[in-house]
């Protein structure tokens, strides 16, 4: 018996070593992150295949093989299967998305809205820039900046054989939420107050989207006023609320433009809508035209708590402008030095007259 054990034990060790040496090996090609809300992990690339698992946005995977447009990956739970390589982000792009998010978090919100259609989120303005995510229709987003990019209409988007034409289009830097089924955990998580469907787990995300694919959530009276004035809104804010017998009424500031997309100015028009207590309706309390304003517009408070807003004027006399709402009257607030310069210019012009 002892002799048999002396033979069996070394033989078993040899078998174990050989099995380990000749085990199937997976080459490690790097890591990647899922860029879709959800995608299926398949057993093979054949037409007849089985689903192994479901991956979600932000999941980290190890890439162990490549075949055309598909990659073989290993998940954090150890599952191995195939996914579309176009649905994964390289580590450098993932880190870039984190930097964009951190920068967007520090920016003041310029407007709130929802996606009109399925909308690609990109790292920079431009339809050829790398894609980070795709929002579904009706997803809430917060606008924090505006940009401009060239847009070339390809031939299948035109009804004739005209030469391809390069246009400029507006883009918004937005922050929103990538939603995940309940119970899922991702590589990036944080708090956010954007409304999402009950039960969904969410992680914040930021990037650039085509501006006209976002519908701003303007109050109805403001929307009607902007439409009748033929002004396209690019930013809007609630300045304050006034008490009425039927409840508090918000008073709003809206920035917009009448120009086509792709202009250097973020907005050229400012309008303030206030509530008229006597007539029980909204009215346009303030209009400023012929601006060339730059986002962000920042809200503040005056010495008595009055709403103030400020922005940079980037044409003509490049300066910061400040306005204050007192009850239903909006006036520009000038710094003492600025007021003296204006008085001096007026006096010089008056003395120059014959």
PLM ranges: what are they?
Residues 2-5, 17-36, 50, 60-62, ...:
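Boundary regions of SH3-family modules and the immediately adjacent low-complexity/disordered segments
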Residues 40-44, 112, 116, 121-124, ...:
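Core beta-strand residues in small-molecule sensory/regulatory alpha/beta domains
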Residues 57, 245-251, 277-279, 300-308, ...:
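Short, solvent-exposed coil/turn segments at beta-strand boundaries
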Residues 286-354:
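Hydrophilic extracytoplasmic domains
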């Amino acid at each position: 018996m002892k002799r048999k054990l002396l033979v069996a034990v070394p033989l078993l060790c040899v078998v174990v070593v050989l099995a380990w040496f000749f085990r199937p090996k997976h080459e490690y090609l790097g890591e990647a992150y899922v860029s879709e809300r959800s995608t299926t992990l398949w057993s093979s690339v054949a037409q007849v295949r089985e689903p192994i698992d479901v991956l979600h946005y932000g999941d980290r995977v190890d890439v162990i093989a490549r075949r055309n447009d598909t990659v073989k990956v290993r998940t954090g739970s150890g599952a191995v299967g195939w996914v579309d390589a176009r649905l994964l982000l390289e580590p450098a792009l993932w880190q870039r998305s984190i930097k964009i998010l951190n920068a967007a978090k520090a920016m003041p919100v310029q407007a709130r809205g929802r996606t009109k259609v399925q909308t690609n989120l990109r790292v920079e303005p431009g339809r050829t820039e790398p894609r980070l995510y795709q929002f579904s229709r009706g997803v809430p987003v917060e606008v924090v900046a505006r940009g401009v990019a060239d847009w070339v209409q390809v031939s299948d988007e035109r009804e004739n054989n005209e030469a391809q034409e390069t246009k400029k289009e507006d883009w918004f830097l937005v922050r929103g939420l990538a939603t995940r089924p309940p119970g899922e955990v991702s590589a990036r998580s944080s708090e956010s107050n954007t409304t999402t469907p009950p039960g969904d787990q969410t992680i914040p995300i930021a990037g650039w989207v085509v501006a006209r694919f976002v519908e701003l959530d303007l109050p109805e009276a403001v929307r009607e006023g902007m439409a009748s004035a033929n002004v396209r809104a690019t930013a809007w804010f609630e300045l304050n609320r006034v008490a009425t017998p039927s409840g508090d009424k918000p008073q709003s500031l809206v920035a917009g433009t009448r120009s086509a997309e792709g202009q250097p100015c973020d907005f050229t028009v400012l309008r303030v809508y206030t509530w008229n207590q006597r007539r029980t309706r909204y009215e346009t309390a303030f209009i400023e035209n012929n601006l060339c304003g730059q986002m962000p517009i920042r809200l503040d408070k005056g010495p008595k708590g009055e709403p103030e807003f400020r922005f940079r004027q980037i044409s003509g006399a490049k300066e910061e402008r400040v306005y204050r709402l007192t009850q239903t009257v909006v006036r520009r607030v000038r710094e003492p030095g600025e007021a003296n310069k204006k008085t001096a210019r007026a006096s010089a012009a008056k003395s120059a007259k014959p």
